[in-house]
Regions:
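Pyridoxal 5′-phosphate
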Residues: 131-135
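Glycine-rich, mobile lid/loop segments that gate access to catalytic sites or pores
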Residues: 118
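C-terminal edge-of-domain segments
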Residues: 142-159
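RNase III-family endoribonuclease catalytic core
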Residues: 2-114, 122
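Short acidic capping loops at alpha-helix termini that bridge into adjacent secondary structure
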Residues: 125-128
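SAM-dependent methyltransferases
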Residues: 1-2, 159
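Short active-site-adjacent structural elements
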Residues: 108-109, 138-141
Length: 159
């Protein structure tokens, strides 16, 4: 058995007038992440971690923010396409550990639905998906509620 670890990170600016998508869940908030797609930082960080673990580059290579086909795309579709790429290399996901850093909104009430979304797309058990949240104690861009960041670590196993 061959195991591979991947790490992903994604940042997005928060702006008024955009929906707030996280882990495939639309969370009610007066700001949303600015981006070419739906700007779901959590799913983007997971995509990057999966691609990195499989030595397949990064999300920008496969889903460039200059391609019209990805404009406002649901990031669950990007995660599905990422899963197809790693599955083609005979990898399965062992587990995922994530952290989202933001001041608001509070997200943990939505974590179960996010875990279900991620597990469903990646064909894994919900108990293999961890989502945590933290703040920067009001420091930096996240602390000023100008943006947010998500971190993801994944473990892959070759079939």
């Amino acid at each position: 058995m061959a195991y591979r670890i991947g790490f992903g990170i994604d940042f997005h600016q928060l702006v008024e007038g955009r929906p707030f998508w996280l882990g495939g869940v639309n969370i009610n908030h007066y700001k949303g992440a600015l981006g070419h797609s739906d700007a779901d930082v959590l799913l983007h960080a997971i995509c990057d971690a999966l691609l990195g673990a499989a030595c397949l580059g990064d999300i920008g290579i496969h889903f460039p923010n200059t391609a019209e086909e990805y404009k406002n795309i649901d990031s669950k579709i990007l995660l599905q396409k990422t899963w197809e790429l790693i599955a083609a290399k005979q990898y399965t996901v062992v587990n995922i550990d994530t952290t989202v850093c933001l001041e608001a909104p509070k997200i943990m009430a939505h974590a179960l639905k996010m875990r279900i979304n991620i597990a469903d797309v990646l064909h894994i058990n919900i108990d293999d998906v961890s989502i945590k949240a933290t703040t920067t104690e009001k420091m930096g861009f996240a602390g000023r509620e100008e943006g947010l960041v998500a971190y993801a670590t994944v473990l892959l196993e070759r079939k």
